[in-house]
Swiss-Prot record:
Protein name: Nucleotide-binding protein GSU1884
InterPro entries: P-loop_NTPase (IPR027417), RapZ-like (IPR005337), RapZ-like_N (IPR053930), RapZ_C (IPR053931)
Cited HAMAP family: RapZ_like (MF_00636)
Any matching Pfam family: PapZ_C
Family membership: Belongs to the RapZ-like family.
Keyword terms, alphabetized: ATP-binding, GTP-binding, Nucleotide-binding
Binding locations of GTP: D59, I60, R61, G62
Binding site for ATP: G8, L9, S10, G11, S12, G13, K14, S15
Any one GO MF annotation of this record: ATP binding
Cited function: Displays ATPase and GTPase activities.
Organism in which the protein naturally occurs: Geobacter sulfurreducens (strain ATCC 51573 / DSM 12127 / PCA)
Length: 285
């Protein structure tokens, strides 16, 4: 039986993920005490129902969950089930804004401010986050994008889709994307920001791309990085991974990282892989 544990910070999108899982045929249970994990899984198995798996939503409301999850996960795995932990996250700023929009109090604390609740929840869930199979940062996602991302990862993990590569550019000044599997820093490449006629452009503009890509150090870097990726992709596939996020960062996320990601798009497409591209900070940098 495939068992998904949906967890993460309050306000990060877990409820949206559950709706996607229900549509995909998962038996979903919200806020179940950790000690009842094995029981509910056993009941679903015995019922004979044709379900895609069991999805259990666990968060800060289940205090005993935080204390006993490792032992229970091991027990479930030893029973022959596959346990995947999907951790939903977002920046503190985004979470505060979401709570403000919904006018809800933070569930982690009966009293105190929302920022205090977020900090406390992060501390309590830190160990679980380290064990996560996937970390999904929803800070920059709308509801439709989040649904698509969850759908892609869930369907891919069941083996119905080929490996999907998500290439994204970002700016280090805005933070590393939390959902990254591979992060490449390209701040060592020549920076168009300091060329007056290129500064206002982006890595999607032909003159900016030419400036970045025609430098000898860029060509050498791409050759070596592509060799590494070509080696890694089959290894990830053998491990059952179906969604690989490769993040490329420069200072502002506007010029170099964008140009490199666009070059990698063609490379991965040439390998016959499904490729999705996003430029997170292109308009910020």
């Amino acid at each position: 039986m495939r068992v998904l544990v949906i967890t993460g910070l309050s306000g990060s999108g877990k409820s949206t993920a559950v709706r996607v899982l229900e549509d995909e045929g998962f038996f979903c249970v919200d806020n179940l005490p950790v000690l009842l994990f094995p029981t509910i899984i056993d009941l679903v198995c015995r019922s004979g129902e044709n379900v895609a798996g069991v999805a259990l939503v666990m968060d800060i409301r289940g205090r005993d969950f935080i204390k006993g999850f490792e032992k229970v996960f091991q027990q479930i795995s030893e029973a022959g089930h596959t346990v995947e932990v999907i951790f939903f996250d977002a920046t503190d700023e985004v979470l505060v804004r979401r709570f403000s929009e919904t006018r809800r109090r933070h569930p982690a604390l009966e009293s105190g401010s929302v920022p205090e609740g977020i900090r406390y929840e992060r501390e309590q869930l830190a160990g679980l986050r380290r064990l996560a199979t996937h970390v999904i940062d929803t800070s920059e996602l709308n509801v439709h994008q989040l649904k698509e991302l969850v759908h892609s990862r869930i369907k891919g993990e069941s083996g119905t889709r080929p490996l999907t590569i998500h290439l994204q550019s970002f700016g280090y000044r805005f933070g590393i994307p939390l959902e990254s599997d591979i992060v490449m820093d390209v701040r060592f490449l020549p920076n168009p920001h300091f060329v007056p006629e290129l500064k206002a452009g982006t890595g999607l503009d032909e003159n900016v791309r030419t400036y970045v890509l025609e430098k000898p150090e860029t060509r050498q870097f791409l050759e070596r990085f592509m060799d590494l990726l070509e080696f890694l992709v089959p290894s990830y596939q053998r491990e059952g991974k179906s969604y690989l996020t490769v993040s490329v960062g420069c200072t502002g996320g506007r010029h170099r990282s964008v140009a490199i990601v666009e070059e990698l798009r063609a490379f991965f497409a040439g390998l016959g892989l499904v490729v999705k591209v996003s430029h997170r900070d292109k308009e910020k940098g």
